């Protein structure tokens, strides 16, 4: 028999240290990881303090993990001489992974227009697929979206006009 506390602990996400070589990049990741001044500062920070915010990964059916959020931290960890990175392991669908990956990177400054365009397109397609799936919603899609299209919701979420989102895509 398990106690209530044990059942609650089993349901919680845990932070685990994973080897960098166990984690593959997100397929078609639209954001470039480059060696710039910000990366140099991140490498130095990781050398001094370790990785302060865990990455988010999902398990792959073939073994290992797929990076959802934390590509720059993983790259910087390697440059800092680390072999592991703290990660939250979460089971996510392809669409959930895409939406989280895009959202976690949109807060970055200095995004290239090409990165925004590809990211907006990926997220919009994932949102549209989720809108078609009845198992992901407890109400009719029209009610869930409050009469708005996926493109309108995307524009609101990223702080751009609908016209600007349309131009990017």
Question: Language model features by range: what are they?
Answer:
Residues 1-90, 96-110:
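Short, charged/polar connector segments at secondary-structure boundaries
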Residues 31-32, 75-167:
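Amphipathic, charge-rich alpha-helical segments that serve as recognition/docking helices
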């Amino acid at each position: 028999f398990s106690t209530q506390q044990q059942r609650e602990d089993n349901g919680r996400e845990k932070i685990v240290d994973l080897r960098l070589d166990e984690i593959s990049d997100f397929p078609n990741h639209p954001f470039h990881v480059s060696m710039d001044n910000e990366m140099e500062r991140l490498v130095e920070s990781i050398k001094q303090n370790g990785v302060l915010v865990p990455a988010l990964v999902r398990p792959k059916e073939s073994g290992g993990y797929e990076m959802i959020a934390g590509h720059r931290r993983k790259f910087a960890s390697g440059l800092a001489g680390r072999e592991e990175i703290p990660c939250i392991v979460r089971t996510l669908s392809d669409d959930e992974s895409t939406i989280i990956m895009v959202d976690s990177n949109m807060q970055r400054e200095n995004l290239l227009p090409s990165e925004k365009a590809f990211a907006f397109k990926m997220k919009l397609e994932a949102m549209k697929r989720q809108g078609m799936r009845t198992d992901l919603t407890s109400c009719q899609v029209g009610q869930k979206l409050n009469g708005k299209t996926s493109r309108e919701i995307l524009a609101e979420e990223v702080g751009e006009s609908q016209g600007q989102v349309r131009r990017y895509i």
